[in-house]
Amino acid sequence: MAGGVGARVVVGRHIYGNLYGCDPQILRDESALITIIKEATKIANAMLLSVGSYRFGPNGGLTVFAIVAESHISIHTWPEYGFATVDVYTCGDHTDPKAAFDYIVSKLKPQKVEAFFGDRSMYKE
């Protein structure tokens, strides 16, 4: 049931956001973004399964993602606009997606952040 009615049987928390005014250099730095996403996984208390990345052209943006046992973390960048989007979705009470999101934000140093939270849990009557 939506809105937290009944007992929660599956815990799912999704924090995601838009980051404006980031340094374009970091948004192009694949190695740095991979390091950031690996550290964010630890901070979220999630179990890292796989990390991947894709560069869109020689000077284009990047998609960097971590598949974790509890779901995923992703960073998508548009360096030409100083813009990035971040998703941290985890399942389980033991994880802290907000801490991971906040860590990524601290490393990308945006001038403005729009953050959103989604309860992706399942509730049973």
Curated annotation (Swiss-Prot):
Q: SUPFAM superfamilies of this UniProt entry?
A: S-adenosylmethionine decarboxylase
Reaction(s) catalysed (UniProt annotation) = S-adenosyl-L-methionine + H(+) = S-adenosyl 3-(methylsulfanyl)propylamine + CO2
A Gene Ontology cellular component where this protein is annotated is: cytosol
Question: Mind telling me how this protein is modified after translation?
Answer: Is synthesized initially as an inactive proenzyme. Formation of the active enzyme involves a self-maturation process in which the active site pyruvoyl group is generated from an internal serine residue via an autocatalytic post-translational modification. Two non-identical subunits are generated from the proenzyme in this reaction, and the pyruvate is formed at the N-terminus of the alpha chain, which is derived from the carboxyl end of the proenzyme.
An annotated GO BP = spermidine biosynthetic process
- Assigned protein family: Belongs to the prokaryotic AdoMetDC family. Type 1 subfamily.
Which protein, by its recorded name, is this? Answer: S-adenosylmethionine decarboxylase proenzyme
The gene for this chain is: speH
